[in-house]
């Protein structure tokens, strides 16, 4: 079993890492950090390089969790990528970070986050910075 953590280098991504590592440790399973840049997106903004991926794996070790970083590209539907990873790695949950929003913003959840919450094949844990 694994816990999948959807990660982009941002405060929301760091919140997802913290919550995901805590869940993986509590369940005594490994963590799979999925950094999935959109095909054609500005990769320097969202894609981790090898040293950043190694730093995340070290952060997991310090949290008492075994982790691996995967970087599958996706076209338009991130949830399909996460569901495929969840199936391939026997995931028990997906963890994502959400931006804090105003009252109106809460009504209109981010489109990727909403898709993940509605279409995920496994339970989703959300967290904020």
Please provide the spans of the model-predicted regions:
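Structural beta-alpha unit
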Residues: 62-94
């Amino acid at each position: 079993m694994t816990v999948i953590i959807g990660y982009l280098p941002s405060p929301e991504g760091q919140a997802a890492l913290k919550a995901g590592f805590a869940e993986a440790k509590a369940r005594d399973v490994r963590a799979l950090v999925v950094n999935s840049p959109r095909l054609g997106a500005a990769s320097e903004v969202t894609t981790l390089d090898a040293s950043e991926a190694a730093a995340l794996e070290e952060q997991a070790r310090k949290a008492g969790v075994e982790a691996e970083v995967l970087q599958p590209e996706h076209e338009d539907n991130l949830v399909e990528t996460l569901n495929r990873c969840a199936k391939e790695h026997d995931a028990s949950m997906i963890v994502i970070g959400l931006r804090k929003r105003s009252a109106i913003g809460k009504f209109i959840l981010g489109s990727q986050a909403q898709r993940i919450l509605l279409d995920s094949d496994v339970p989703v844990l959300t967290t904020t910075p």
